[in-house]
Amino acid sequence: MAQLLRLKPQPDGVFCYNDPLATGAMDYAIDQGARIPEDVAIIGCGNLHYDDSLRVGLSSIDQHSRRIGEGAARIALGILGSRVPRPPETVILQPELVIRASTRRKAHRRGR
């Protein structure tokens, strides 16, 4: 995050691998004087529930991890309980963008 904040021009936003990395990036940026989302927007992945413990609400991609786990368990139990080989199964879950304050920026582009 330190390198990104030193770039000229700075990036408009940062997409982090997961929510814990995003919260760390956001805390660092704020500690360095950056305004979230005015100076840099930050989004994570996982939609972990931080309640009100964050200084700025974190936008996130909800991958529906619980549904993934439940589906994987159902498939695994089906395989274990069957004497007949099962064909491969494809399961597609649509991720959901959960918008919170860390990416809520006014429509106009900030000056640099």
Regions found by a protein language model. Name each.
Residues 2-111:
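Flexible loop/turn connectors
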